[in-house]
Amino acid sequence: MSQAEFEKAAEEVKNLKTKPADDEMLFIYSHYKQATVGDINTERPGILDLKGKAKWDAWNGLKGTSKEDAMKAYINKVEELKKKYGI
């Protein structure tokens, strides 16, 4: 998997005909962050920020995953979503 394939997938996911389910969006978000930033580097959001906590927890769950593995999983998930939702 190359950086170019990853960047293409990042653009394609924005053009899906239907918004993916929340769990699919968390997968996409967390793997994108792991691939581009690496291990989480922020504090967990406060108790009232439910969406922020869900995103933080999903990204934190990937701690230790290599950028390459996160990139590969991201690309594979986008391909799956393209088949499911169309672009």
Curated annotation (Swiss-Prot):
<dbReference type="InterPro" id="IPR022408">
    <property type="entry name" value="Acyl-CoA-binding_prot_CS"/>
</dbReference>
<dbReference type="GO" id="GO:0005783">
    <property type="term" value="C:endoplasmic reticulum"/>
</dbReference>
<feature type="modified residue" description="N6-succinyllysine; alternate">
    <location>
        <position position="8"/>
    </location>
</feature>
<feature type="modified residue" description="N6-succinyllysine">
    <location>
        <position position="17"/>
    </location>
</feature>
<feature type="modified residue" description="N-acetylserine">
    <location>
        <position position="2"/>
    </location>
</feature>
<keyword id="KW-0929">Antimicrobial</keyword>
<feature type="modified residue" description="Phosphotyrosine">
    <location>
        <position position="29"/>
    </location>
</feature>
<comment type="similarity">
    <text>Belongs to the ACBP family.</text>
</comment>
<keyword id="KW-0446">Lipid-binding</keyword>
<comment type="function">
    <text>Binds medium- and long-chain acyl-CoA esters with very high affinity and may function as an intracellular carrier of acyl-CoA esters. It is also able to displace diazepam from the benzodiazepine (BZD) recognition site located on the GABA type A receptor. It is therefore possible that this protein also acts as a neuropeptide to modulate the action of the GABA receptor.</text>
</comment>
<feature type="binding site">
    <location>
        <position position="51"/>
    </location>
    <ligand>
        <name>an acyl-CoA</name>
    </ligand>
</feature>
<keyword id="KW-0597">Phosphoprotein</keyword>
<dbReference type="InterPro" id="IPR014352">
    <property type="entry name" value="FERM/acyl-CoA-bd_prot_sf"/>
</dbReference>
<dbReference type="Pfam" id="PF00887">
    <property type="entry name" value="ACBP"/>
</dbReference>
<feature type="binding site">
    <location>
        <position position="55"/>
    </location>
    <ligand>
        <name>an acyl-CoA</name>
    </ligand>
</feature>
<dbReference type="InterPro" id="IPR000582">
    <property type="entry name" value="Acyl-CoA-binding_protein"/>
</dbReference>
<keyword id="KW-0379">Hydroxylation</keyword>
<comment type="subunit">
    <text>Monomer.</text>
</comment>
<dbReference type="InterPro" id="IPR035984">
    <property type="entry name" value="Acyl-CoA-binding_sf"/>
</dbReference>
<feature type="binding site">
    <location>
        <begin position="29"/>
        <end position="33"/>
    </location>
    <ligand>
        <name>an acyl-CoA</name>
    </ligand>
</feature>
<keyword id="KW-0256">Endoplasmic reticulum</keyword>
<feature type="binding site">
    <location>
        <position position="74"/>
    </location>
    <ligand>
        <name>an acyl-CoA</name>
    </ligand>
</feature>
<keyword id="KW-0333">Golgi apparatus</keyword>
<feature type="modified residue" description="N6-acetyllysine">
    <location>
        <position position="51"/>
    </location>
</feature>
<dbReference type="GO" id="GO:0005794">
    <property type="term" value="C:Golgi apparatus"/>
</dbReference>
<feature type="modified residue" description="N6-acetyllysine; alternate">
    <location>
        <position position="8"/>
    </location>
</feature>
<keyword id="KW-0007">Acetylation</keyword>
<dbReference type="GO" id="GO:0000062">
    <property type="term" value="F:fatty-acyl-CoA binding"/>
</dbReference>
<keyword id="KW-0813">Transport</keyword>
<comment type="function">
    <text>DBI(32-86) has antibacterial properties.</text>
</comment>
<feature type="domain" description="ACB">
    <location>
        <begin position="2"/>
        <end position="87"/>
    </location>
</feature>
<feature type="modified residue" description="N6-(2-hydroxyisobutyryl)lysine; alternate">
    <location>
        <position position="55"/>
    </location>
</feature>
<feature type="modified residue" description="N6-succinyllysine; alternate">
    <location>
        <position position="55"/>
    </location>
</feature>
<feature type="modified residue" description="N6-malonyllysine; alternate">
    <location>
        <position position="55"/>
    </location>
</feature>
<feature type="modified residue" description="N6-acetyllysine">
    <location>
        <position position="19"/>
    </location>
</feature>
<feature type="modified residue" description="N6-acetyllysine; alternate">
    <location>
        <position position="77"/>
    </location>
</feature>
<feature type="modified residue" description="N6-succinyllysine; alternate">
    <location>
        <position position="77"/>
    </location>
</feature>
<dbReference type="GO" id="GO:0042742">
    <property type="term" value="P:defense response to bacterium"/>
</dbReference>
<keyword id="KW-0044">Antibiotic</keyword>
<protein>
    <recommendedName>
        <fullName>Acyl-CoA-binding protein</fullName>
    </recommendedName>
</protein>
<feature type="modified residue" description="N6-acetyllysine; alternate">
    <location>
        <position position="55"/>
    </location>
</feature>
<feature type="binding site">
    <location>
        <position position="14"/>
    </location>
    <ligand>
        <name>an acyl-CoA</name>
    </ligand>
</feature>
